[in-house]
UniProtKB/Swiss-Prot annotation:
PANTHER family: MELANOREGULIN (PTHR34340:SF3). Belongs to the melanoregulin family. Probably functions as a cargo-recognition protein that couples cytoplasmic vesicles to the transport machinery. Contributes to retrograde melanosome transport from the cell periphery to the center. Overexpression causes accumulation of late endosomes and/or lysosomes at the microtubule organising center (MTOC) at the center of the cell. Probably binds cholesterol and requires the presence of cholesterol in membranes to function in microtubule-mediated retrograde organelle transport. InterPro entries: Melanoregulin. One of its GO terms (molecular function) is phosphatidylinositol binding. This is Melanoregulin. Keywords: Cell membrane, Cytoplasmic vesicle, Lipid-binding, Lipoprotein, Lysosome, Membrane, Transport. It comes from Xenopus tropicalis. GO terms for cellular component: apical plasma membrane; cytoplasmic vesicle membrane; late endosome membrane; lysosomal membrane; melanosome membrane; organelle membrane. It is found in: Apical cell membrane; Melanosome membrane; Lysosome membrane; Cytoplasmic vesicle membrane. The lineage of its organism: Eukaryota, Metazoa, Chordata, Craniata, Vertebrata. Its main location: membrane. It is a peripheral membrane protein; Lipid-anchor. The keyword Transport applies. GO terms for biological process: melanosome localization; melanosome transport; phagosome maturation.
Length: 196
């Protein structure tokens, strides 16, 4: 900015004397900035709740994809047809099973004294992350142990990855052992459950 421009700006003597050079509105770094966009996509996928951690090949768990597929198929069918009713029943059954599992987890958390925090602890989104990657192995082992020793999950269910995040939170709160003990008392596996 020369002296004339400075004086014009300072005194506001005439309009239009403060036109900025066009190159000032150009980006400082020119060229392809795709490396930043690629990084953001990878970061989102790594934190994606519905896939296995660090697995970039899919974005949802199998049961989520199956549910979405059923819903899309049902929406294309004629309402109240026999096939529509079957799909509607399957969708309802899967959603009800998920609600029951969530309610079991909530009851245990409330028994641990997390009455106000239970919903927050159970809330897992795509932005959720594992607090410490070192906890991942322990959280998975404890989730498998929970599945093997309790009926908190329905028989034949794959372990939902979203509960891995909750186990990680319980590890951070140092409440995971108490959670397992209460779960084993409230939802023990019977001999009949083991034989299935």
């Amino acid at each position: 900015m020369c002296l004339k421009d400075w004086l014009c700006a300072f005194c506001c003597l005439r309009l239009g004397c403060l036109e900025y050079p066009k190159n000032e509105k150009q980006p400082l770094v020119s060229g392809n900035n795709n490396q930043y966009k690629t990084y953001a996509v990878i970061d989102d996928d790594e934190r994606n709740l519905w896939s296995s951690p660090h697995d970039l090949s899919h974005t949802e768990a199998v049961d989520d994809r199956m549910l979405q597929s059923w819903i899309q198929t049902r929406n294309q069918l004629e309402k109240d047809s026999e096939e529509w009713q079957k799909l509607n029943y399957e969708i309802y059954t899967l959603r009800q099973a998920r609600r029951e599992v969530r309610a079991r987890w909530r009851r245990i958390l409330e028994d641990l004294g997390f009455q106000k925090e239970a919903e927050t602890l159970l809330s897992v989104t795509k932005q959720s992350t594992i607090s410490n990657p070192k906890n991942m192995k322990r959280a998975m082992e404890l989730l498998v142990k929970l599945s093997d020793n309790t009926t908190i999950f329905p028989a034949g269910w794959d372990l939902p990855v979203r509960y891995l995040y909750i186990m990680d939170r319980l590890i951070c709160l140092d409440a995971v052992d108490d959670f397992l003990n209460i779960a084993q008392k409230k939802y023990p596996k019977t001999k009949m459950d083991i034989s299935q």
